[in-house]
């Protein structure tokens, strides 16, 4: 595991910057070697929708899911996001491939796809970059 850039902060622009840095590094990610866009900012001031998008994209990037919030005082919404077993399963898929952008159907929209273990299995995310 290695960091790919700067320290993240709890702002949507910082989350986007981390995603943009990681976007072209898929060939370096895989079992035993992970691109680390930094810890999660979920529950630290982003909106609930931004928190969901942030957590989901870290999973699509096969990034380490390291909670940066105070788990002793997190809200029920934050806990639900951080413990979403389906999203965690995508992140932890044993194939370990990082998602890539496969289409940009609009100014602020990206479609990401990630190959998963199993026959012809993929995770797909529609990522809205807008706030």
Tell where the protein language model's regions lie, with residue ranges.
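Glycan-recognition surfaces
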Residues: 1-70
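Generic structural hydrophobic/aromatic packing signal, biased to beta-strands
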Residues: 2, 40, 60, 82, ...
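Generic hydrophobic/packing signal
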Residues: 3, 28, 35, 42, ...
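Intrinsically disordered, low-complexity peptide-like regions
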Residues: 5, 22, 36, 84, ...
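Mature, folded catalytic cores of secreted/periplasmic enzymes
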Residues: 9-13, 17-21, 68, 87, ...
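Low-complexity, compositionally biased segments
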Residues: 10-12, 23-27, 41, 73, ...
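Catalytic cores of secreted or luminal carbohydrate-active enzymes
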Residues: 53-104
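Carbohydrate-binding surface patches
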Residues: 58-61, 66-68, 104-131
């Amino acid at each position: 595991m290695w960091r790919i850039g700067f320290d993240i902060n709890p702002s949507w622009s910082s989350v986007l910057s981390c995603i943009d840095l990681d976007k072209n590094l898929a060939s370096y990610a895989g079992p035993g070697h992970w691109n680390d866009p930094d810890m999660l900012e979920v529950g630290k001031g982003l909106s609930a929708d931004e928190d969901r998008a942030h957590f989901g994209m870290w999973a699509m990037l096969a990034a380490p899911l390291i909670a940066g919030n105070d788990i002793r005082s997190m809200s029920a919404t934050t806990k639900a996001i951080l413990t979403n077993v389906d999203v965690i399963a995508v992140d932890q898929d044993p194939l370990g491939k990082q998602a890539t952008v496969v289409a940009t159907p609009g100014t602020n929209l990206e479609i990401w796809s990630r190959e998963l273990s199993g026959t012809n299995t993929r995770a797909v995310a529609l990522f809205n970059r807008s706030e």
